[in-house]
Amino acid sequence: TKASVGFKAGVKEYKLTYYTPDYEPHDHDILAAFRVTPQPGVPPEEAGAAVAAESSTGTWTTVWTDGLTSLDRYKGRCYNIEPVAGEENQFIAYVAYPLDLFEEGSVTNMFTSIVGNVFGFKALRALRLEDLRIPPAYTKTFQGPPHGIQVERDKLNKYGRPLLGCTIKPKLGLSAKNYGRAVYECLRGGLDFTKDDENVNSQPFMRWRDRFLFCAEAIFKSQSETGEIKGHYLNATAGTCEEMIKRAVFARELGVPIVMHDYLTGGFTANTSLAHYCRDNGLLLHIHRAMHAVIDRQKNHGIHFRVLAKALRMSGGDHIHAGTVVGKLEGERDITLGFVDLLRDDFVEKDRSRGIYFTQPWVSLPGVIPVASGGIHVWHMPALTEIFGDDSVLQFGGGTLGHPWGNAPGAAANRVALEACVQARNEGRDLAREGNEIIRKASKWSPELAAACEVWKEIKFEFQAMDTL
């Protein structure tokens, strides 16, 4: 690769340069685990090396300008390949990237390199990024979440239990005033948060400024009546970064505690800009993962959500939707809890049974609160409390607004169910075994909860799991 060797034109096998089984990864390398499905006749070593090359310094032919740089210093290296158990012709290729390949503090640049061109590569039938190890040296170039779990609890003055939320439905079509009314009723009934749906931005039936004003009124009215701090996730997502920041500025001027962003459709550059604004101005930031299933649903191609979750923790967000394990949206228990730990904890050990391919130290990057949302109702409360623990937001949209008596009773039912589960857990009871009994007993003292129990006693969303190891 040095100029003195002389330049020899032509196409050579990637594995001669980029497959290095003897390489010991450095502490400051970014490590990636790819699930590779090569085309028939392509050896796994060549496929793994091709991934390393095309996502770092390589191109399809030898170029004479290779002689002007130290390829050994900058190239990605495929350092290990292992077959995937139970799958024919699938391999996990481990690739190490030198840190100098990436711009500091830019998730955008990291993804452009690692998953940019290589996913359209002809030698591969399919390719999936299963996990990334982000070294502390790179992590420290990111601000991360605007505030993190502990600061959020201090701002809200809420401790020792999960937080309760509700997405306002119907998601599209309400006028701003009716929307604000639904927000008020839910918050007044006992919820901590209400939420704009991900596709509520600024449409003809409800412009963003009107919605912000009516929701702020609902927040302050419910706060003064309950003595609790309340919030509504005001969706600041917009067509341009400038417009998004303008909406966040208006939210700050109204004095509300939290705004929201759709981080995948909005993009990582916009998300990181908003996260910086939120930290500088005391706003919490709720993140919705709209579009994630386009990227992470296929088992053999795309990017696993645990990578998107890590990227969000780096880019910045205080809450992110993370599946439910029990509702209508997909999420397998061990795998979901794997990326929930990656969002919340300071240090996560490698654990292949939960899909965690690398030990991940987060140094002092604040944590993100996972949000369980999608098809959940009061009967799920014991399971959700046990699975997600205190540092979570449990979000019941239809499970609040679908209550036969209205929005406020729906909120009250959820709050009573949650308080009953937390109390039972603190007394040492087994929520998994005794959950239904705990809810039934609580419903004797809460007519709202009793009505909710009756409505949703038969509802189940049971389909085969897609996300298996």
UniProtKB/Swiss-Prot annotation:
<keyword id="KW-1015">Disulfide bond</keyword>
<feature type="binding site">
    <location>
        <position position="167"/>
    </location>
    <ligand>
        <name>substrate</name>
    </ligand>
</feature>
<feature type="binding site">
    <location>
        <position position="321"/>
    </location>
    <ligand>
        <name>substrate</name>
    </ligand>
</feature>
<keyword id="KW-0150">Chloroplast</keyword>
<dbReference type="InterPro" id="IPR036422">
    <property type="entry name" value="RuBisCO_lsu_N_sf"/>
</dbReference>
<feature type="active site" description="Proton acceptor">
    <location>
        <position position="169"/>
    </location>
</feature>
<keyword id="KW-0560">Oxidoreductase</keyword>
<comment type="subunit">
    <text>Heterohexadecamer of 8 large chains and 8 small chains; disulfide-linked. The disulfide link is formed within the large subunit homodimers.</text>
</comment>
<dbReference type="InterPro" id="IPR020888">
    <property type="entry name" value="RuBisCO_lsuI"/>
</dbReference>
<dbReference type="Pfam" id="PF00016">
    <property type="entry name" value="RuBisCO_large"/>
</dbReference>
<comment type="function">
    <text>RuBisCO catalyzes two reactions: the carboxylation of D-ribulose 1,5-bisphosphate, the primary event in carbon dioxide fixation, as well as the oxidative fragmentation of the pentose substrate in the photorespiration process. Both reactions occur simultaneously and in competition at the same active site.</text>
</comment>
<feature type="modified residue" description="N6-carboxylysine">
    <location>
        <position position="195"/>
    </location>
</feature>
<feature type="binding site" description="in homodimeric partner">
    <location>
        <position position="117"/>
    </location>
    <ligand>
        <name>substrate</name>
    </ligand>
</feature>
<dbReference type="GO" id="GO:0019253">
    <property type="term" value="P:reductive pentose-phosphate cycle"/>
</dbReference>
<dbReference type="GO" id="GO:0009507">
    <property type="term" value="C:chloroplast"/>
</dbReference>
<keyword id="KW-0503">Monooxygenase</keyword>
<dbReference type="InterPro" id="IPR036376">
    <property type="entry name" value="RuBisCO_lsu_C_sf"/>
</dbReference>
<feature type="binding site" description="via carbamate group">
    <location>
        <position position="195"/>
    </location>
    <ligand>
        <name>Mg(2+)</name>
    </ligand>
</feature>
<feature type="binding site">
    <location>
        <position position="373"/>
    </location>
    <ligand>
        <name>substrate</name>
    </ligand>
</feature>
<dbReference type="GO" id="GO:0004497">
    <property type="term" value="F:monooxygenase activity"/>
</dbReference>
<keyword id="KW-0601">Photorespiration</keyword>
<feature type="modified residue" description="N6,N6,N6-trimethyllysine">
    <location>
        <position position="8"/>
    </location>
</feature>
<dbReference type="InterPro" id="IPR033966">
    <property type="entry name" value="RuBisCO"/>
</dbReference>
<feature type="binding site">
    <location>
        <position position="198"/>
    </location>
    <ligand>
        <name>Mg(2+)</name>
    </ligand>
</feature>
<feature type="binding site">
    <location>
        <position position="289"/>
    </location>
    <ligand>
        <name>substrate</name>
    </ligand>
</feature>
<keyword id="KW-0479">Metal-binding</keyword>
<feature type="active site" description="Proton acceptor">
    <location>
        <position position="288"/>
    </location>
</feature>
<comment type="similarity">
    <text>Belongs to the RuBisCO large chain family. Type I subfamily.</text>
</comment>
<feature type="binding site">
    <location>
        <position position="197"/>
    </location>
    <ligand>
        <name>Mg(2+)</name>
    </ligand>
</feature>
<dbReference type="InterPro" id="IPR020878">
    <property type="entry name" value="RuBisCo_large_chain_AS"/>
</dbReference>
<keyword id="KW-0456">Lyase</keyword>
<feature type="site" description="Transition state stabilizer">
    <location>
        <position position="328"/>
    </location>
</feature>
<dbReference type="GO" id="GO:0009853">
    <property type="term" value="P:photorespiration"/>
</dbReference>
<dbReference type="InterPro" id="IPR000685">
    <property type="entry name" value="RuBisCO_lsu_C"/>
</dbReference>
<keyword id="KW-0120">Carbon dioxide fixation</keyword>
<keyword id="KW-0460">Magnesium</keyword>
<keyword id="KW-0602">Photosynthesis</keyword>
<dbReference type="InterPro" id="IPR017443">
    <property type="entry name" value="RuBisCO_lsu_fd_N"/>
</dbReference>
<feature type="binding site">
    <location>
        <position position="171"/>
    </location>
    <ligand>
        <name>substrate</name>
    </ligand>
</feature>
<keyword id="KW-0488">Methylation</keyword>
<dbReference type="Pfam" id="PF02788">
    <property type="entry name" value="RuBisCO_large_N"/>
</dbReference>
<dbReference type="GO" id="GO:0016984">
    <property type="term" value="F:ribulose-bisphosphate carboxylase activity"/>
</dbReference>
